[in-house]
Amino acid sequence: MKHTRMKLKTVVKNLHEGWKFRQARLTNWYPATVPGVVHTDLLQNKIIEDPFFRLNERGLQWIDKEDWVYETCFTLAADMMRKENMELVFEGLDTYADVYLNDECILKADNMFRCWSIPVRQYIREENNILKVYFHSPVKIDVPKWDALPYQYPASNDQSENGGLFNKKISIFARKAGDRK
């Protein structure tokens, strides 16, 4: 019996262009860089001062207490639309994020250290695909977890005090990169 091997060709479309972002409770959109982080987008759009200059960081502790929305629109070429399988791949969503494709929630992420691969063929259209990532504040998610415990976990590297959370060391609840201070 003779076996033949089919060579499958993977086609990749990077979605790094055309992103915008906003504070979830506000309506003003600003240009965003993806991949990136909200702090650099805020700085690039002159919404905040340089956090590394003098004591500016102290006045920027509100950022991680807010929810943020990132959005882009993309089109697929006709040959891509003929593909049987399509996946959307995220490498490092920080951290609590809901991902929507054309108003369908396709992912609820909770771990910055993993790659997320989501089958999306059923949600994709050739034009005007709207991809939205809603980033939840880790403070809003994790403070209730801390409050619910009758004891405290050790977290000597936690920066909660600097962020105005006093002794609520919430970093132990999130699969998220820590501050490098």
Protein language model annotation of sequence segments:
Residues 4-25, 38-46, 65-181:
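Accessory beta-strand-rich segments of carbohydrate-active enzymes
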